[in-house]
Amino acid sequence: MSDREEHEPTHRLSRRTVLRLGLLAASAAPMLAGRAHAQDKPGAHLIGKLEGPELVTDPAKLPKSFKEAPELAELVKAGKLPPVEQRIGQDPLVIKPLRDIGKYGGTWRRGFTGPFDTSNGHRAAQNDKLLYFDHTGTKIVPNIARGWEVSPDGRVTTIFLRRGMRWSDGQPFTADDFVFWFEEVYQNKELVPTPLPVMTINGKPIAVRKVDAATVQFVAPDPYFALPTVLASVWGIGHHARYGRDALGGFAPAHYLKQFHPKWSSKDEVTRKAAEMKFDSWVALFKNRNDACRNPDLPVVTPWKTISPINTPTWILERNPYSVWVDSAGHQLPYIDRIRMTLAENLELLNLRAIAGEYDSQARHIDISKLPVLLENQKKGGYRVYLDPSTQGADVGLFCNQSFDRDPEIAKWLGTREFRIALSHGIHRQQVNETFVLGLGQTGSAAPGERTLYFPGPEYKTLHCAYDVKKANAMLDQLGLTKKDSEGYRLRTDGGGRLRLALTTYLGFLPFTQVAEMIVQQWKQIGIRGEVQEMERGLATARLRANEHQIYFETQWGADNMFGHSPFFFPIDGGTPVGPLYGVWYASAGAQGKQPPPRMREVMEKYRKAFGVPDAERTRLAKEVWKIALDEMWVIPVVSNSPASQGVRVIKTNMGNIPERLWNSAVSDNPHIAHTETWYFKS
C-alpha cells in the first residue's frame, strides 16, 4: 500500500564523486540537524523553508465567479461540456497558491520505470483523498471531502461531501458511491478475501452508511478517534485512485463498475466478459476496470486522469474537466494541461535524462549520488535542485527479525537486546553517511524528525548509536561470546562454528547492498561475521513473509506517523521485517502466527489502544511506543532523515508555485502535498 512496494536500484558512489561533493556535504549535513546558522554556508540554499499553499475556508474570501482552461471553454462553447460553475459544484475546494495565480497550459514531463511504478502517478497527479495533511504534516485538512466530524464517543465519523461534485465523466459523486463500495465490493469475499485492518477497531468491523446524498458515516462498534488520520493517509480507504486496483479505496464509481459486477448481470455474464477481454476471472476484470492507472475509461475524481495507461511506453494524464479544485481567484485547477511520463528502461537512463533537463519536475527515482552532476548542469539544463530531507527516521536500517526460528542460536541473539545494541555500536555511521548519502543524513537513532507529531524527545536522538568498538566488544564478551576463531570472529555457543549473520538486501532507492558490505567490514572489529545476501525484490519479500530472513535492510517507511502508515519499526502484519510471525499474531488477534515477548506485546497494546483515544492521549501513547522501540533497537539505524529517498528534486526554472522544501514521507505523497494542481509554467 505504499512506495515500499515499488523500488528501483541505485548505484555505488565513486570516491571521486564523494570528493567532488565534499564542500556541499559539509555544509548541508548540519542543516539537517536543525542548525539555523548553517544558512550562510555554501550549499545552504538546497534545503529551504518547509512551505505550501493554503486552503481558503473563509466564506468572505471565496471566489464569486469562475474561469476555466481555454480548451475547456471551447468545449463549453461547442455544447460538449456544461459551464464550469456546474462542473465544480456548490462547494469547490479553493486553494490560495503558494506564490502566484498561475497560467493555463503546458505539459509536465516526468520519467517512470514501468507498469509497477504506479506511485509515480499517485504522488504527482492522482490525489483523491477524502482528507489530507497540510504541508507541515501535522494538521489534517479537508480535500475532496468538504469536512468531517467525529462524535463525542468516537464511534461515528461523519464525512461531508462537496455538494454537486462529479466524477470525471460528469456523473454525480455521492454517498451512494461509498455504500456501493462497502456493500458490493469490500464485503464481497471474492474481491476482498481478508478484512482491511483499518476497517476494524479492536478486531471488530466498522460499517459505512449513507445519511443523505452528500453525507456518509463510518460507524465503529468501539471508539475510533484515529479514523480521520487513517482517511488522510495511505491505509487503503479514503483514496480511490490508489487502491481501486485492490478493490479497496472507500468509494468507487458505482454507475460505471456495476457492468462488471455479477449482482447487476450474472456470474456467467461477467465471467464471459472477462474471458473476452482476456482476464482469467471476473474478479481480475473488475479490479482492472477499477484501476486508475490502467483504465482510461474509469471515472475518477482526481485533478488529472489517465488517457494513455501505465502499461504503455508513455503514460499520459490529462486535466479532469470536472476537477473540484479552484484557485483563490476562481480559476478551475489544474493549471497544467497534461502530464506525460516517459518510460525509462533503467534508473541510470532516467537520471541521465534529468541531468539533461528533459524533465520538468522529478524527484522519484533521482539517485542522490548524481547530485554533484545535477548541480553542475543546472544552468545548462534549465533546472534547479532542491533537497527534501525525509522525516521517517531510518532511511537505511537493519531490521532484526525477532520471530526468526530456523536457527535457535541465531534466533537467541537476534532476540537479545544487548546483542542488537552491541551491533549498533560497531557501525561507523558517519563513514556510511559520507560515502553513500553525501553527508546529508543524520547518524543517530531511528527516531522520526524533531518536528513530527510523535518525536519522543531529544534524549532519544542518539540512543545506543555512538560508534564505540570497545563498548561493543565488552557487551559481546559479557553475553558469553568470548571464543573466537583464528581470524578473530566470534564462535557460536552451541559448538556450531563461526557465528554468521545473514544480511538480506535488495535493489532499492538506496544502495542497501553496498552499505551492508561496508558494515560487514566494520563489524570485523567486533568479531561479528556478516554475510550479504542480495536478491531480487520479489524474492526478498517472499523470504521475509516466510520468516526466513535474519537481518533485512530496508527504509523505515512512514514511521513519522504510525497511524498513517504501517509503522514498520515494530510488527503489525506479516510484511513487517522486524518480526513477520509476530505481525501475523497481532493482525489475527492471536489466532495465527506466534506470540511475541512481553516488551513487544506492550508496544502492540499501546498502539492498538491509541487508535481508539482522542488526539492528546494518542500522542502520549505514540511517544511511549517510540521510546520502547528505540531502546529495544529492533531496527538498528544507519543513516536517518536524509533526502536520499525521493528527496532530490529537479525542477525546471520556468515552473511556478514550487515550494523551497516539501514534507518528504510515505504518508505525505510528495510532491502532491504541495498541491501540484497549482503548479504552472511561467513561460
Model-flagged regions — what are they?
Residues 40, 181, 185-195, 208-209, ...:
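Extracellular/periplasmic solute-recognition and catalytic clefts
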Residues 99, 104-124, 144, 227-235, ...:
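A structural "hinge/loop" feature
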Residues 146-192, 217, 350-353, 412-415, ...:
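Aromatic- and charge-enriched surface segment that lines or borders ligand/interaction sites
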